[in-house]
A protein has these predicted regions:
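Conserved catalytic-core helix/loop/strand module for nucleotide-ribose chemistry
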Residues: 2, 12-113
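Glycine-rich beta-strand-to-loop/alpha-helix junction loops that act as flexible
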Residues: 7-10
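Conserved small/polar residues in nucleotide/adenosyl-binding loops
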Residues: 122-128
């Protein structure tokens, strides 16, 4: 079976209604990256960082995979497909893609800095 590697970024999930980072109305229009996406931000203002990512999780849960996600998943019927994405949402998986590598992590999976075991994002609170 032939192998196909598909690379995706924010555009594929934007069609599902998820905000991108760099568009004029994107996430960086309302947040400074230094305030929510750095180790220093997590150390200095954990509550703001947790609120930012929880907002993104809530947004993601309200969105559905689009035709692009489904088309990529459909390739698995004829090919050995690996999806490599910059996206942190789970729309590829929800569309049916079985092998997805997230280059920037996943909103649905967390790892504690104190305990290497993955934890569910629903259990994370600002003081942890």
């Amino acid at each position: 079976m032939k192998k196909i590697v598909v690379f995706t970024g924010a555009g594929v999930s934007a069609d599902s209604g998820l905000a991108t980072f760099r568009d004029s109305d994107g996430l960086w229009a309302n947040y400074r990256i230094e305030d929510v996406c750095t180790p220093e931000a997590l150390r200095d203002n954990r509550a703001q960082v947790v609120d930012f990512y929880n907002m993104r999780r809530r947004e993601m849960l309200g969105k559905e995979p689009n035709a692009g996600h489904r088309a990529i998943a459909g390739l698995e019927e004829c090919f050995d497909v690996e999806v490599i994405t910059q996206n942190v949402d789970n729309l590829h998986e929800r569309a049916g893609s079985s092998r997805v590598t997230h280059l920037h992590g996943e909103l649905t999976k967390l790892r504690s800095s104190r305990d290497p075991e993955s934890v569910s994002y629903t259990h994370l609170r600002a003081h942890e």
